[in-house]
Curated annotation (Swiss-Prot):
InterPro entries cross-referenced by the UniProt entry: Na/H_antiporter_dom_sf, NhaA
Gene that this sequence comes from: nhaA
Predominant location category: membrane
Membrane topology: Multi-pass membrane protein
Subcellular location: Cell inner membrane
Residues annotated as transmembrane: 17-37, 53-73, 89-109, 118-138, 147-167, 171-191, 198-218, 251-271, 283-303, 321-341, 354-374
GO biological process: regulation of pH
Taxonomic lineage: Bacteria, Pseudomonadati, Bacteroidota, Flavobacteriia, Flavobacteriales
Tree of life domain: Bacteria
Protein name, entry field: Na(+)/H(+) antiporter NhaA
Family: Belongs to the NhaA Na(+)/H(+) (TC 2.A.33) antiporter family.
Role noted for this protein: Na(+)/H(+) antiporter that extrudes sodium in exchange for external protons.
GO molecular function: sodium:proton antiporter activity
Catalysed transformations (reactions): Na(+)(in) + 2 H(+)(out) = Na(+)(out) + 2 H(+)(in)
C-alpha cells in the first residue's frame, strides 16, 4: 500500500484532534446539564449578523473542514492510496458497504415515517475520532490498516457530501446555483491555465460559497468543489494544493472541529432516557453505526477480494478488517452534521445527537478491544 507525503502529518493531527474532541464533547455535555446551561445554550444561539453562532460554525467554518477533506481526497486520487485503481478498490468497496448496510438498517426501522430522512446519519465516519482510537494502540497497528481506515473514512465523507447535495437539498434557487457553478468553472479554467497563485482561488471560493449558501444546496459542498479547482501540480511541497493542505491541518483539527463539537453537543439529557432509546430513529441509528458499519465494510470488502477486484494487503487479515470496521461506526461529528440537515424537530435532533454519541462510544470501545485482541493474536502467531 502506498503512503503519501502528508499522510503522517494528517494522521498525527487527526489522532490528537480526536482526543481533544473527546474532551470538548465531555465539557459541552457537562455544561449543558449544569446550573449555567441556559447561558451556555443561549451563547451558541446568540445572533451574529442575522444568524446564530451555531449556524455560522455549521455553514461557514465547516466549509473549511470539507475543503481539507477535498484536498485529502484529491491527493489520494492523484498520488496516494486511490491513485492505483487496484489498491483503491478495497477501501472503496468497504466504504460503499459501510454506507449501504447502515442506511438499509435505518430504513428497516423508519421507512414510511417522518424520520426516514435520517437514513444518511449512520452512513458517515468521523475521521478524527476513528484515528484517535486507532492511535491508542500505538505502534502495533500495521501501516496498511491506518491507510485503509483513513481512505475508507475519506470516501465515506465524500459519500456523505453527495448525500447532503442530493437528498438534503429542499428548495433550489437555480440562478444562484448556476452562478456558483459558473464560478467553479472559472476556477477550473484558471487551473488549466496553470495559475498557481492561491489568492484568486480563495476569493472565488468565498463568492462561490455565498451563492451556494443562497441556492438551497448546503454551502459546505463549496469546500470540496474548491479543493478540486485548486492546482495539484506534481504534489510536492511547492504545489498550491500542498501549501494550503499543510496550512489547514492544525486550524481544522484544533479549532474548527472542536468548535463544532462544543456547539453541537450541548445536549440537554432527557429525564426519560429509556424512552429516547426505544424510538425507531434511535434504534435505526444505533443499529446502523454499531452493526451496519462493520458488517457492511467487512462483507463488501470480502466480496471485492473474492471476485478478484482487489487483494487484501499481506499484513492484514479479515479479523482486522472486521475490527477496524467498528471504528468506522464512530459517526460523531459527521453523523451529527447530517442530523441537523435531516430533521427539523428540536426534540428529535437532541435525542438523535445523544444516540449518536452513545452509539459512537460503543462502536469505538468494541473496535479498540477487538483490534487489540486481533493484533495480539497476530503477533503471537507470527512468533510461532
Amino acid at each position: 500500500m502506498k503512503i503519501t507525503g502528508l499522510f503522517k502529518e494528517f494522521f498525527e493531527s487527526e489522532k490528537s484532534s480526536g482526543l481533544f474532541l473527546i474532551s470538548c464533547t465531555l465539557f459541552s455535555l457537562v455544561i449543558a446539564n449544569s446550573a449555567i446551561a441556559n447561558s451556555y445554550l443561549h451563547f451558541w444561539h446568540a445572533n451574529l449578523a442575522g444568524n446564530s453562532l451555531e449556524y455560522w460554525i455549521n455553514d461557514g467554518l465547516m466549509t473549511i473542514f470539507f475543503l481539507l477533506i477535498g484536498l485529502e481526497l484529491e491527493r489520494e486520487v492523484y498520488d496516494g492510496e486511490l491513485s492505483n485503481i487496484k489498491d483503491a478498490m478495497l477501501p472503496i468497496f468497504g466504504a460503499i458497504g459501510g454506507m449501504i448496510v447502515p442506511a438499509g438498517l435505518f430504513l428497516v426501522m423508519n421507512f414510511g415515517t417522518k424520520t426516514q430522512s435520517g437514513a444518511g446519519i449512520p452512513m458517515a465516519t468521523d475521521i478524527a475520532f476513528a484515528l484517535a482510537i486507532l492511535s491508542l494502540l500505538g505502534n502495533k497497528i500495521p501501516l496498511s490498516l491506518k491507510i485503509f481506515l483513513t481512505a475508507l473514512a475519506v470516501i465515506d465523507d465524500l459519500g456523505a457530501i453527495l448525500i447532503i447535495a442530493v437528498f438534503y437539498t429542499k428548495t433550489l434557487l437555480w440562478t444562484n446555483l448556476c452562478i456558483a457553478l459558473g464560478i467553479f468553472g472559472f476556477l477550473l479554467i484558471l487551473n488549466r491555465l496553470k495559475i498557481r497563485n492561491l489568492i484568486p482561488y480563495l476569493i472565488g471560493g468565498v463568492f462561490m460559497w455565498y451563492f451556494m449558501l443562497h441556492s438551497g444546496v448546503h454551502a459546505t459542498i463549496t469546500g470540496v468543489l474548491l479543493a478540486f479547482a485548486i492546482p495539484f501540480g506534481n504534489g510536492d511541497s511547492r504545489s498550491t494544493s500542498y501549501i494550503l493542505q499543510h496550512f489547514l491541518h492544525k486550524p481544522v483539527a484544533f479549532f474548527i472541529l472542536p468548535l463544532f463539537a462544543l456547539a453541537n453537543t450541548a445536549i440537554v439529557l432527557s429525564s426519560n432516557i429509556s424512552e429516547t432509546l426505544i424510538q425507531n430513529y434511535s434504534i435505526g441509528i444505533a443499529l446502523g453505526l454499531i452493526i451496519g458499519k462493520p458488517l457492511g465494510i467487512f462483507l463488501l470488502s470480502m466480496l471485492a477480494v473474492s471476485l478478484g477486484i482487489c487483494k487484501l494487503p499481506d499484513d492484514l487479515n479479515w479479523k482486522s478488517i472486521l475490527a477496524v470496521g467498528f471504528l468506522g461506526g464512530i459517526g460523531f461529528t459527521m453523523s451529527i452534521f447530517i442530523t441537523l440537515l435531516a430533521f427539523n424537530d428540536d426534540t428529535i435532533i437532541n435525542n438523535a445527537k445523544f444516540v449518536i454519541l452513545i452509539s459512537s462510544l460503543i462502536a469505538g470501545i468494541i473496535g479498540y478491544f477487538s483490534l487489540k485482541y486481533v493484533l495480539k493474536n497476530t503477533i503471537i502467531e507470527n512468533k510461532n
